[in-house]
């Protein structure tokens, strides 16, 4: 009888790097602190689940690029899809409740995030420039939260 090896959900669902958590959570928590409300809760979900989706989608991409489908590939696609769904719900929540132009900082930082995603797919995310790009991309969530709260109009 042949059995398929089990795959740990934790190894697929949670990224292993420690610094990424700080770069992700600090601007998101700052946005919640500076402009609490559903608009920043949505940005929190977008940023957090976008960060979480990166790891399983990278695993799935690497497997599929090699032309292989392992048990972890299917799990990674499912988990990544769920994370992306929550991220999109966060974006929708922010879009429906924002009182200001929250997309400006995110749009300006988008090329940095795209560069980081590209380098991550090439297994070069730990190089200096991708690390800096990722930190700057995530930092854009703090001003996005303030703008979403309409605080820009009160200045």
Predicted regions and their residues:
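Short, Lys/Arg-rich, polar N-terminal cytosolic tail immediately upstream
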Residues: 1-13
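Hydrophobic, aromatic-rich alpha-helical transmembrane segments
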Residues: 16-20, 36-40, 44, 72-77, ...
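Alpha-helical transmembrane segments and their cytosolic membrane-interface
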Residues: 40-103
């Amino acid at each position: 009888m042949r059995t398929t090896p089990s795959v740990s959900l934790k190894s697929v669902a949670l990224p292993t790097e420690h610094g990424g958590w700080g770069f992700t959570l600090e601007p998101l928590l700052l946005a919640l602190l500076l402009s609490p409300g559903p608009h920043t809760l949505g940005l929190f979900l977008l940023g957090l689940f976008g960060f979480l989706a990166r790891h399983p989608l990278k695993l799935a991409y690497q497997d599929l690029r090699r032309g292989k489908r392992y048990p972890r590939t299917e799990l990674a696609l499912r988990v990544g899809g769920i994370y992306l769904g929550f991220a999109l719900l966060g974006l929708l929540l922010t879009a429906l409740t924002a009182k200001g132009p929250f997309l400006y900082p995110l749009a300006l930082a988008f090329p940095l995030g795209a560069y980081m995603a590209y380098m991550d797919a090439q297994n070069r995310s730990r190089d200096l420039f991708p690390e800096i790009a990722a930190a700057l991309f995530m930092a854009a969530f703090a001003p996005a939260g303030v703008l979403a709260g309409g605080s820009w109009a009160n200045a």
